[in-house]
Amino acid sequence: MAYRFEVDRSNCINCGVCMDVCPVHALDMTRTLSPSIESGVGGSPTRDQQPWMMEFPIQSGECIGCELCSVECPTAVIQITAIHAPAELAAAQGPIRHGPESETGWAALSEYTTESLRELHTDPWGDLAGWRAARRQESWQVWRTWNTDGEGTDRLFAPCQEACPVGTDAGRYVALVGEGRYAEALGVAAEYNPFPSVCGRVCTAPCEPACRRGVMDEPIAIRELKRFAADHGMEGYPTPPPPAQRRPERVAIIGSGPTGLSAAYQLVRSGYGVTVFEAMPVAGGMMAIGIPEYRLSKQVLQAEIDRILSLGVELELNTALGRDISLDDLKRQGYQSILIATGATMSQPLGVAGEDLHGVWPATLFLKRVNLGENVTLTGDTLVVGGGSTAMDAARSAWRAGASSVRVLYRRTKEDMPAQHEEIRAAEREGIVIEPLVAPVEVLGRQGSMTEVRCERFAIVGKGADGRNKVAPVPGSTFTIRARNLMVAIGEAPDPSILPEGSSIQFGEWGCLLTDSETLMTAQSGVFAGGDVATGPKSVIEGVAQGQRAAWAIDRYLQGLPAARYVPLWRSRAPLPLTDRIVLDLANRERAKSELAEVSREDRHGEVSLGFAAERARAEAQRCLRCDVVTSCQLVEVKRTVSV
């Protein structure tokens, strides 16, 4: 019999079960070497593939049509159809006998045998102990996963890890949570990221859209599980060991946001002396003064900052670049390298008449005053212009500060808002109204204070290159909204006053410091820049990744090594040898949701999202398909409790 083997690659989770159960070794999950149309590089992905996905070369002459691969495929993506049936082939192969089923409905490979003249009552490949791990190591990990730039690496990584800017091995810490090993889970989550608790609360979670579980039902709640690991694993989590050797060089880092402190964390662990200079009276950058406490507890943030400082990082507060110190001052003090990580703290203006009236606030200034503990009280109706996280934070904080009503004006559709969906839902749950396709054109007032805002409506006129809707003003659609306060949250930019006029370090067209794209070095040798000051506003996790990269570049510079292409440390780590059984739970279960606290105006600071209880966290973690380790595990067991 000859067969046609078809795979829906968009729904394949790369578990390798099909290769395991094939009794005649007809399946080999290796990447084909034919060049793709787009890149011309052998083995690189085509347009309909994820970079890490595998092809499925089939030895069709060996296939006996038993359909074990199709039956056991956890996502039901394999179809086998007969195309012709030469009698001699069918007779030579003989019938297939299924081994006894386990309670889960899946039998190990050694329990399947062929019965033929050649292989009577024997396993196809003799002793199978260790076969799965060895064969997968040969078939999968010597092939290459191709990144968008066409460069290959010698390992495959789970899609969640590929999507994380710092390469957090989410699959490992999720699995450890599922086993109740919380301190170990925290150790994995903090391996490259000194802010697991912070990111467990406010990360944009790019790992979750990449999660293959989302193909079946819903993605794993990876961010919430990181928070759970951080909240419950700290007691047994050891302090990182001191560096193997102390180096004589000293590094000055200007700015204590996620980039600055992430770089400090990496550099001090490499043995360098590190001092962080912060302009504000508190450390943490925008994590401390830009994110409200109901989303990120100050106690949680300070605990992670203290952990970094405990490694030997020195911190000087109320010390601003351009006001209290200069780059030349730091060089005279003996710092051999400097990292500028001052962020993007200046709110972009609306550019409309009347925005200088009393009652018009830069959203970042409002949030800063609230987070520094000032007793900011609002009265009357409040408008917020913008659609990102800053706009949502300002709107929800305005409601807590006493505003009688809060409306968010956004010139595109609600679906186009860059804020996370849960932020928008949380704002609406608190009574905040989202007004899409509306933007202000003038602020009106009397006696120096604003009284109303003239707005116009917009309409969708097509799609932009970024996939978002393009909009245009609707002629004759202007109207006014009475309001006492207007928060402007349409973007932030770096503060140019940090550098003197005539400095060789320049700001670019978009207001960011110019740096070498690979090394992050500025025009001054030994002076680097990273984070929002060099990239524009990004998320916390992207800031942490920038700090990781800056630390790598500074380390190479101080060692006198030549400039090189940046390869994150996590990409060079060897996979863990695995011999334990992995259980894939394919029961259709809803994604777990965080418990929410009752919200009141009186409680301005209590966290709204309370995270998971232990039972819920472990159940959610056990939904993971373990894309991170199926390439090296000797046995994958599938709970086939439902059809998928």
Question: What is the meaning of each model-derived region?
Answer:
Residues 97, 276, 280-311, 315, ...:
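Rossmann-like dinucleotide-binding cores of NAD(P)H-dependent redox enzymes
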Residues 358-363, 429, 455-463, 501-529:
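Flexible glycine/proline-rich, aromatic-decorated loop/lid segments
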